[in-house]
């Protein structure tokens, strides 16, 4: 008898876990992905600085579309990105955009990947992610290749299957053509030669 009562109680409690009438993502515990729109309805991520709100969820929406697991915010990666972007280094070309940080993996337990986005206006985390994801139109998963003359590496880093963590920073570098800059660092980093992102 006691076993039956406990079983009945568990069944009733289990049925109360989600509100079937609630709109997707409305407190039912999970993030909902609209595959057609490439959007995700999820709670904000703790740790994202002002101006970057939604960047992790934007990444995870795109990752869900290709069947790879979500990223989590990593304060250590965010600190690496923040320390770099605040230096406003543009020596490699110069291009009016912050250079990549060649030393970004120093002191971190894995190789660190990096995406950089710059805007002549005001950059945002979701705008940066949308720019990187826009490269997917040039990427061909079946041959793991990119159209000639096009860039796909930002997109492939966003969806890299072995990457599990992300940390980003936003800063405005005065005098740069694309001064409002978002830097995202990823661990473990992607774009490993000869490997497919997913």
Where are these regions (language model features)?
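Sec-dependent bacterial lipoprotein signal peptides
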Residues: 1-14
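Ser/Thr-rich, Pro/Gly/Ala-heavy low-complexity intrinsically disordered linkers and tails
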Residues: 13-48
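Residue-level detector of conserved, well-ordered beta-strand and adjacent loop positions
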Residues: 17, 35, 117, 169, ...
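Short, well-ordered surface patches within globular domains
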Residues: 47-112
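Non-transmembrane alpha-helical segments in soluble domains
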Residues: 56, 60, 82-86, 117, ...
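Short clusters of hydrophobic/aromatic residues that line enzyme substrate/ligand-binding pockets
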Residues: 71, 116, 158
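A solvent-exposed, acidic/Ser-Thr-rich amphipathic alpha-helical stretch
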Residues: 103-119, 124-129
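Disulfide-stabilized extracellular recognition modules
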Residues: 120-198
């Amino acid at each position: 008898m006691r076993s039956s009562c406990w079983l009945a109680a568990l069944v009733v409690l289990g049925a109360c876990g989600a509100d079937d009438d609630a709109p997707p993502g409305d407190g039912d515990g999970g993030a909902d992905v609209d595959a057609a729109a490439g959007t995700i309805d999820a709670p904000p991520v703790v740790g994202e600085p002002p101006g970057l709100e939604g960047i992790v969820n934007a990444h995870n929406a795109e990752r869900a579309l290709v069947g790879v697991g979500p990223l989590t915010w990593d304060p250590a990666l965010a600190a690496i990105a923040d320390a770099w972007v605040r230096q406003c280094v543009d020596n490699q070309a110069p291009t009016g955009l912050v250079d990549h940080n060649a030393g970004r993996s120093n002191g971190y337990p894995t190789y660190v990947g990096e995406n950089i986005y710059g805007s002549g206006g005001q950059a945002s985390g979701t705008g940066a992610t949308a720019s990187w994801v826009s490269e997917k139109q040039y990427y061909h998963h079946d041959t793991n290749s990119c159209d000639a003359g096009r860039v796909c590496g930002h997109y492939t880093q966003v969806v890299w299957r072995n990457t599990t963590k992300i940390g980003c920073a936003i800063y405005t570098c005065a005098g740069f053509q694309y001064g409002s800059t978002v830097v995202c660092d990823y661990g473990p980093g992607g774009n490993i030669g000869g490997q497919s992102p997913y």
